[in-house]
């Protein structure tokens, strides 16, 4: 999945959920890094990180996707799907972080950098925080 959609002008506050679907401690740690990086990047862009989902204009969800690296390969590749949903549930934006990365090449630093880079595509909110 690639970046799709643009956050509408009424989105000023975003609740960031913890990433789901981690199958190992390393993926859980990378998910925590992704959450922190998303909050920091969104705030740096002028969005308000809502402390509660009910207070947010939209919710950013992250889900780990795990697959085999080819038909007969025992190696696994991972990617983190990020989806921004409006309160009503419609998708406003979606992107893939570290798509198709072999598990042994995944690092917290790479996740942090890629999350920040991909969320830049949202652009700034219309009236700041």
Regions found by a protein language model. Name each.
Residues 16-18, 49-75, 80-81:
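A short, hydrophobic beta-strand-centered structural micro-motif
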